[in-house]
């Protein structure tokens, strides 16, 4: 049964929209180190409901996104889950690079559809502090109609995968960096690696000042499309509250299907196979500087929001499972990506810098418990595991 109020539904706001007054709320992207840098603010709204505000240095756009969990975490299922955002951003980025390489080679692609599966693991006991989140290799199927022979097509697709900026998170074995505030005072870290520099100011009271820009699309950017079809996943789960069990040995599978519409919008159906849940349709488009019109969030925005959402969920799980006090919690995350090797014209593989996350906790627990909240949340976060694990995307090609 859902816990807490359904704030996302009560707000009457779209789940995703462009913020037109970023200067008023004070969000600015970090310095642009290697191509694009994004600052992501996230706050908890109600148990597992969260909202993010993401600002990009390259595009100049600021987006608000929202996330929720389904019955497996006693959520309201009002918005797509945190892991879906990385899958959506990743498959959108792959489509960007494939189409850019095809354009460079003057290749006509008559039809294309991408099908992606992301897999994660959760093993151990929360009470024993042995629970660890993991990430497994990604599977990508490209359904395509074009005139390239098999060898040339395979080479193009592998080059596109490597050219994606997310390649830097997958292949870099990046250890994330952190800073921690408890009740408005910075405290020393436990096991986590520290950020060099000062703790950022807490965006505590700045979220409520944003204003939504009217959409240029005659449809929601995010909307539910029904229950995900069931498929057998070894170690998969579907029961209510299953993600809150103390002892776990489970496999998660988030899928995505991406098509490129005639209007230039990438339409992505997110599939929640395990834990089994609701499918959502999400739209993506690159900004004008990257060749699009910026009518929906770009790939880097979805990826950045996804990591921060997933990390925030682990705080919620930890304190709920151990009955700890955590009144409010927020993060400010900085992510740094290169331009795409094809879409950005670098001709190089995509790269990234380690994520830098500032954490703000309001709690009556001790400093040691606050440190443990951060350490366990990082330890159990699937997407921080994704960043520190060297993985390749497994490619399969289907001719249409």
Label each residue range with its predicted role.
Residues 90-94, 310-311:
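Alpha-helical metal-binding/catalytic segments enriched in His/Glu/Asp
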Residues 1-88, 99-305, 316-400:
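Extended beta-strand/beta-hairpin segments
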